[in-house]
Amino acid sequence: MRIGFLSHAGASIYHFRMPIIKALKDRKDEVFVIVPQDEYTQKLRDLGLKVIVYEFSRASLNPFVVLKNFFYLAKVLKNLNLDFIQSAAHKSNTFGILAAKWAKIPYRFALVEGLGSFYIDQGFKANLVRFVINSLYKLSFKFAHQFIFVNESNAEFMRNLGLKENKICVIKSVGINLKKFFPIYVESEKKELFWKNLNIDKKPIVLMIARALWHKGVKEFYESATMLKDKANFVLVGGRDENPSCASLEFLNSGAVHYLGARSDIVELLQNCDIFVLPSYKEGFPVSVLEAKACGKAIVVSDCEGCVEAISNAYDGLWAKTKNAKDLSEKISLLLEDEKLRLNLAKNAAQDALQYDENIIAQRYLKLYDRVIKNV
C-alpha cells in the first residue's frame, strides 16, 4: 500500500512516528512523509524516507492564506495517489483530512495527541480559535474513517462535539524507546561529576523537562523551588521562543531553578535525577513522564487531563493539585524525605513503562489500520 504521514512539523514525524513507519516499511508498504520545509526535512531524508514538501503557514489565521495552503496540499496529495493517510495535530486533522477527501484518498486516519494551548488560554483570540477548530473538526468527523486519541479525556471531548463512537480509538501514548530509556545505578563518582558539570550543589536533583511555557507549570515549579531550595537542586530543561505563552529568559534565569535550555542529553539527565516533575495544566499523554518512568524515577505530576492517565496516584508517582505550588512542593518534599516511598514508586514506574514500548504501540496502530480498512 502507498501510505502518507501528514504533519505540520517535521519534528513530529522524526520524534514520534518513526516506529510506526518502520513497522509499515518492514511489511513492504510504501511510506511517504508529507511535511513543510523545516530543519527536520533533511534529517527525515537521511533516514531513507520519501519526503514530500508542501507549503504551510503555521501561525497564519488569514483565510486567504489558509485556502491557498489547502488547495496546494490537496494537489500534492492527489498527485501521490495514496491508499491511506495518517494525520496528526489540529490543522492536519481538519484541513488535511478535508484535502485528503478532495484528493480521493480511500482511507483517512486522524491522531489527536492533545488539544493544545488554545484549549487552556482564555481571551477573545483563544475563544475564537477554539470555535474555529471545533467547527472544522465537526466537518472532518464526516470524512475521517478513524480518530485515534492518546487519552480518554480528549476522546470524550470529541465525542461531545459529535464524533461517532465507531470512529473513536484510544491508544495511550505514541510509545517510547526502552532500549534508550531504562533504569541504571549511577555510581557516586559519576554523580559527583554530573553535579560538577552542571555547577550545582551536591543535593538531590528535581528535574522538569518541558518547553518553557506557562501552561506547562513553569511558574509553580519555580515557586516550589524557592520553598525547597535548601533541600534539593531544581533543574528545568526545555527550549523557548518569543511568544506570550513562554516564560521570559529574565524569569527563567532568576530564582532558585537552574535553567539549562534545550538539551540533547535527556537520557543522562533523567538517569541522574532523583525526582521528575511535570506540573502541567493539560496534557495529551506526556512522553517525558513515560521516559522518566522507564528510567525508574519517582514522579510528581499535576492532577490534570493526560497526566492522571500516565501516572497512578501513590502507585508509580504522586498527583499534585494543578496550578498549586504549595501542594506541588509538599509532594516533592514528601519524596525527598521518604526514601522508601520514593524507591517504591520508582520501581513501580519502571515496571509500568514496559507496556509503552514503541514497538508494542506501533503494532497496535497497524492492527487498527488493518481492521478499519477491512471493515470500510
From Swiss-Prot:
Record carries keyword Transferase: yes
Keywords recorded for this protein, A-Z: Glycosyltransferase, Transferase
Q: To which pathway does this protein belong?
A: Protein modification; protein glycosylation
Q: Write down the EC number.
A: 2.4.1.290
Q: Which reaction does it catalyse?
A: N,N'-diacetyl-alpha-D-bacillosaminyl-tri-trans,hepta-cis-undecaprenyl diphosphate + UDP-N-acetyl-alpha-D-galactosamine = N-acetyl-alpha-D-galactosaminyl-(1->3)-N,N'-diacetyl-alpha-D-bacillosaminyl-tri-trans,hepta-cis-undecaprenyl diphosphate + UDP + H(+)
**Which CDD domains does UniProt cross-reference here?**
GT4_CapM-like
The record's Gene Ontology biological-process terms are:
lipopolysaccharide biosynthetic process; protein N-linked glycosylation via asparagine
The record's GO molecular-function terms, alphabetically, read: hexosyltransferase activity; N,N'-diacetylbacillosaminyl-diphospho-undecaprenol alpha-1,3-N-acetylgalactosaminyltransferase activity
Question: What are the cysteine partners in each disulfide bond?
Answer: none
The kind of enzyme this is, by top-level EC class, is transferase
What is the role of this chain? Adds the first GalNAc residue on to the isoprenoid-linked bacillosamine (2,4-diacetamido-2,4,6-trideoxyglucose) carrier in the N-linked protein glycosylation pathway. Acts first on the undecaprenylpyrophosphate-linked bacillosamine (Und-PP-Bac) substrate to yield the disaccharide.
- Similarity comment: Belongs to the glycosyltransferase group 1 family.
Miscellaneous information on this protein: N-linked protein glycosylation in C.jejuni consists in the transfer of a heptasaccharide (GalNAc-alpha1,4-GalNAc-alpha1,4-(Glcbeta1,3)-GalNAc-alpha1,4-GalNAc-alpha1,4-GalNAc-alpha1,3-bacillosamine) from a membrane-anchored undecaprenylpyrophosphate (Und-PP)-linked donor to the Asn side chain of proteins at the Asn-X-Ser/Thr motif.
Write the protein's name.
N,N'-diacetylbacillosaminyl-diphospho-undecaprenol alpha-1,3-N-acetylgalactosaminyltransferase
Query: What gene, per UniProt, encodes this protein?
Result: pglA
